[in-house]
Structures are given as structure tokens and as C-alpha cells.
Amino acid sequence: MEAGAYLNAIIFVLVATIIAVISVGLTQTEPCTIRITGESITVHACHLDSETIKALATLKPLSLERLSFHQ
């Protein structure tokens, strides 16, 4: 095999690797996280449609006074 063929093979492998890395990076997404604390409600990386927005609007921060403990 001559030097030009080796160079072409190396370039092909590099381009294929770059394409694979980019495509994997584009398909990975963060999970939807809704964190409710005593002070706030935080929504991170979630797809928000109108139904989800309405549901989130009714949430309130966690409060011990509103919790009931049944014996």
C-alpha cells in the first residue's frame, strides 16, 4: 500500500469518528428534573406543553405544616 492510500484511510477514519461523536452528542439529552424544596420549585431540561405548565402552576413549595402523618 502506498503513502497516499494510508493517508486516505486515516482521513476516512478520523472523519467517521468525528461524525460518530457529533451524532452521539446530539442525541443525548438531560433527564427532565422537577425539584420541589421548601423555598422553590425548579424545572430543568423538561419539555413543557400547555398541560404540564398548568400542572406546574398549581405546585407549591414543600411545607411541613401541610403534611399529614397518619398513625
From Swiss-Prot:
Q: What is its main location?
A: host cell
> Where does the protein end up?
Host endoplasmic reticulum membrane
Positions on the Cytoplasmic side per record topology: 27-71
> Mind telling me which GO cellular component terms the entry cites?
host cell endoplasmic reticulum membrane; membrane
What is one GO biological process annotated to this record?
transport of virus in host, cell to cell
Q: Which InterPro entries match?
A: TGBp3
Return any one Pfam family short name.
TGBp3
**Which residue ranges does the entry give as Lumenal-facing topology?**
1-3
Question: Which keywords, in A-to-Z order, does the entry hold?
Answer: Host endoplasmic reticulum, Host membrane, Membrane, Transmembrane, Transmembrane helix, Transport, Viral movement protein
List where the protein spans the membrane.
4-26
Q: What does this protein do?
A: Plays a role in viral cell-to-cell propagation, by facilitating genome transport to neighboring plant cells through plasmosdesmata. May induce the formation of granular vesicles derived from the Endoplasmic reticulum, which align on actin filaments.
The family note in this entry says: Belongs to the Tymovirales TGBp3 protein family.
Give any extra note attached to this record. Answer: TGBp1, TGBp2 and TGBp3 seem to act together for cell-to-cell propagation. TGBp1 is the main movement protein that physically cross the plasmodesma with the viral genome. TGBp2 and TGBp3 would facilitate TGBp1 function.
Q: What name is this protein filed under?
A: Movement protein TGBp3
